[in-house]
């Protein structure tokens, strides 16, 4: 319950009380999207089959509701991502920090998302997952391979109002160890309108 209570407290303290948000969970297959969604929903770690069809979960934490869409990350599932861009409030893009051979593929998909006009003002939280595995990429290494070294906006409370800059930041995490993603969501929550 600690993570849920903490998450609720963060959102409430940042003015997201009684708000609704639509958040897309995107990334290549096996990055941890479904695992994260279930961890946020009921703090359970379960083995999942690859997501074959888009799924959504309504998460209520206190009086805050958000609808999270897990669209799958395999090649065929990526074709429908665009169908979910309308009225999205944030994108959480997961990358398997251990699977360095797929960084180029992940960068290609992320670049397509970042250049899509319908997502031009949408905040992006990039989560480098699986840092609990030895030899997983560091944050700097992941930023470099995703081409984000000079494009992130800062981890603190950065006022971007009127700047025409899209909030975008990288956080490293281990969903199975329940670490790192909370800080990412805290950062993201300040930019959800």
UniProtKB/Swiss-Prot annotation:
A Pfam family this chain is assigned to: Arf
Catalytic activity from the UniProt record: GTP + H2O = GDP + phosphate + H(+)
One GO CC term on file: endoplasmic reticulum membrane
Gene Ontology MF: a single term: metal ion binding
Disulfide feature: none
Keyword Kinase included in the entry's annotation: no
Compartments it resides in: Endoplasmic reticulum membrane; Golgi apparatus, Golgi stack membrane; Cytoplasm, Cytosol
Entry comment describing in which tissues the protein is expressed: Expressed in most tissues.
Keywords: Cytoplasm, Endoplasmic reticulum, ER-Golgi transport, Golgi apparatus, GTP-binding, Hydrolase, Magnesium, Membrane, Metal-binding, Nucleotide-binding, Protein transport, Transport
Binding positions for Mg(2+) per the UniProt entry: 29, 70
Motif (STAR): 2-4
UniProt activity-regulation remark: Small GTPases activation is mediated by guanine exchange factors (GEF), while inactivation through hydrolysis of the bound GTP is stimulated by GTPase activating proteins (GAP).
EC id: 3.6.5.2
Quaternary structure, from the entry: Homodimer; upon association with membrane. Part of the coat protein complex II/COPII, composed of SEC23/24 and SEC13/31 heterodimers, that it helps recruit and assemble on endoplasmic reticulum (ER) membranes at ER exit sites.
Family designation: Belongs to the small GTPase superfamily. SAR1 family.
Functional summary from the UniProt entry: Small GTPase that cycles between an active GTP-bound and an inactive GDP-bound state and mainly functions in vesicle-mediated endoplasmic reticulum (ER) to Golgi transport. The active GTP-bound form inserts into the endoplasmic reticulum membrane where it recruits the remainder of the coat protein complex II/COPII. The coat protein complex II assembling and polymerizing on endoplasmic reticulum membrane is responsible for both the sorting of cargos and the deformation and budding of membranes into vesicles destined to the Golgi.
Protein name, as recorded: Small COPII coat GTPase SAR1A
The species this protein was found in: Brassica campestris
Lineage, broadest ranks: Eukaryota, Viridiplantae, Streptophyta, Embryophyta, Tracheophyta
């Amino acid at each position: 319950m600690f993570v849920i209570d903490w998450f609720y407290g963060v959102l409430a303290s940042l003015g997201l009380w009684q708000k609704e948000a639509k958040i897309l969970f995107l990334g290549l297959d096996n990055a941890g999207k479904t695992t994260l969604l279930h961890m946020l929903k009921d703090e359970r770690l379960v083995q999942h089959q690859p997501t074959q069809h888009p799924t959504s979960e309504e998460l209520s934490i206190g009086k805050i509701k958000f609808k999270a869409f897990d669209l799958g990350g395999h090649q065929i599932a990526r074709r429908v991502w665009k169908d979910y861009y309308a009225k999205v409030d944030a994108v959480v893009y997961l990358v398997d920090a251990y699977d360095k051979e797929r960084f180029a593929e992940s960068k290609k998909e992320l670049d397509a998302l970042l250049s899509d006009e319908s997502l031009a003002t949408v905040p992006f939280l990039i989560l480098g997952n699986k840092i609990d595995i030895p030899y997983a990429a560091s944050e700097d290494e992941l930023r470099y391979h995703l081409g984000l070294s000079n494009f992130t906006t800062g981890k603190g409370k950065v006022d971007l109002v009127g700047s025409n800059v899209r909030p975008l930041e990288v956080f490293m995490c281990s969903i199975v160890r329940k670490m790192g993603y909370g800080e990412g969501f805290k950062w993201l929550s300040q930019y959800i309108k």
